[in-house]
């Protein structure tokens, strides 16, 4: 889901 993508971006 989009939340997963946002989580990865926050990891950066």
Swiss-Prot record:
Entry annotated with the keyword Membrane: yes
One of the protein's GO biological processes: chemotaxis
Swapping residue 6 to A leads to an effect described as: Important increase in antibacterial activity and important decrease in helical content
Q: Which UniProt keywords apply?
A: Amidation, Antibiotic, Antimicrobial, Chemotaxis, Immunity, Innate immunity, Membrane, Pharmaceutical, Secreted, Target cell membrane, Target membrane
Q: Which domain of life is it from?
A: Eukaryota
Temperature-related properties: Is stable between 20 and 100 degrees Celsius.
Q: What is one cellular component GO term in this UniProt entry? A: extracellular region
Is Translocase among this UniProt entry's keywords?
no
Organ and tissue specificity: Expressed by the venom gland.
Give the result of residue 4 to K, as annotated.
Increase in antibacterial activity, moderate increase in resistance to protease-mediated degradation, complete loss of hemolytic activity, and no change in cytotoxicity towards HEK293 cells
| Name of the featured protein | Polybia-CP
Q: Name the species this protein comes from.
A: Polybia paulista (Neotropical social wasp)
């Amino acid at each position: 889901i989009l939340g997963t993508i946002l989580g990865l971006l926050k990891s950066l």
